[in-house]
Amino acid sequence: MIGLVPADVGMCMKQAVYQDLFLTMGHQLQKLDYYSAAYHNHFADFYDRNKTHTKLGYDRFLARYGGLEGITPVWPESDLEMIDISVPQYIDQQPFSIYYMTVSGHCGYSLKANAMSRKNYDLVDYDGSETVKCYLAAQMELEMAMESLIRQLEEAGIADDTVIVISPDHYPYALERSATWGNAENYLTELYGVTEMDRFTRDSNALIIWSGCLEDKNLKVETPVYSLDILPTLSNLFGLDYDSRLLVGRDVFSDTEPLVLWPEYSWKTDKGTYDSGSRTFTPAEGMEVDDSYVDRIKAIVSNKISYSREVQNLKYFQVLSDFLNGK
């Protein structure tokens, strides 16, 4: 969202709202007079989202018990309901910049604990454990929400001029072996189809960028990509005027060297992975690199983490914003 490595002293978002986040997609599009709104189908004040989301560049934040009326009071709430309630509010306000934080796929994953698992359980064809089947059933709600969103965009005749970006929040930690979640075994390995789990496998997922005009094209980036690459990638796709040096990530469609990093200094490139805990570099299949390569990437990772920390500690974005605006 803000292009920085999360701080190790608390929630990055809560700290960042005390400065001008002028590089977010919300703010950049807001300057171009896009209609803007952020939606969430859980409680408005959870994690102070009622305070943080307007700082991301959205004129209004609507959530359950916070302006988003009609959400059924179950846990977790329905993403499909959120889409169907919210789309009519902005679909005629073109161009628009809309942010959704979905919740239907949240834990826990059982028929007793999860309303979305109960709702969609019979839609899932899966022969494994009930826990994983409940997880998959819960995720189906977002699938149906996206089907509804795209259908409404198509009916309005604007699907070809709309970009949808879907990014995961975190791995499904409630599937891990844990007394907290009542799991006697690690269901993550079942879901991922592996026998062993490390952080590089655990955190693997996908970023989806969709537009109706790209339906016939299947562009796939094979190099490592992560959440901090989203902001520079979208900024370039939209032709926005920004300084890429201020962002940690890269444009994934550029020839910039790919790099994915973790706040604890582990990292992954197209050449291999480095585990900071064991201080071990494992080359990717068919790759050979020398120690100088590993040392160079370690230094880059350290600098990016230090930069992110100092931007937050010194409120550098606010200082820069004041300077650019002549304050």
For the regions a language model picked out, list residue spans one by one.
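Solvent-exposed soluble domains appended to multi-pass membrane proteins
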Residues: M1-K327
